[in-house]
Amino acid sequence: MKVLIVEPGKYPREADIEHTLEAEQAVVGGTIEAVYPWRDSACIVCNDNGIAENLPLNRTLGDYDIIHGTFFVCGLTSNDFTDLTPQQMKRYEELYHDPQLFFLLGKTLCVEHTTPEEYTRVMAPPPKTKESPER
């Protein structure tokens, strides 16, 4: 199944995954949840426990939610997931192209579009400091 995989801090990538529950769960790292934010025949498949598992913030979903962890976008039939069309692949790659950084400014959650390199630099754990020898 041709899908668009979107990982935190990375550019989206086109992938061909097996159309099985196990393969879909492997992509998102757990049990799946389908989200239907658009009127066309496409949906987001994400980890349904992303918040509880404290998965990293990934991309905003409109102006009302944030997807946690890796997700993929796939096409829809009347009762199943299917390949994205080339037009859908292009549309959703453009929509989710830029990784996003999330930070608090006071009590306001802010979102900044960034590059994978900048995301890695900002999100890297602080360097370990050399501990002073005990006396």
Place the predicted regions along the sequence by residue:
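Catalytic phosphate/metal-binding cores of nucleic-acid and nucleotide-processing enzymes, i.e., regions
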Residues: G9, E14, A23, A34-D40
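Short amphipathic beta-strand/extended segments with alternating polar/hydrophobic composition
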Residues: E14-H19, N54-N58, L84-P86
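Short, structured protein-protein interaction patches enriched in aromatics and acidic/basic residues
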Residues: W38-D63
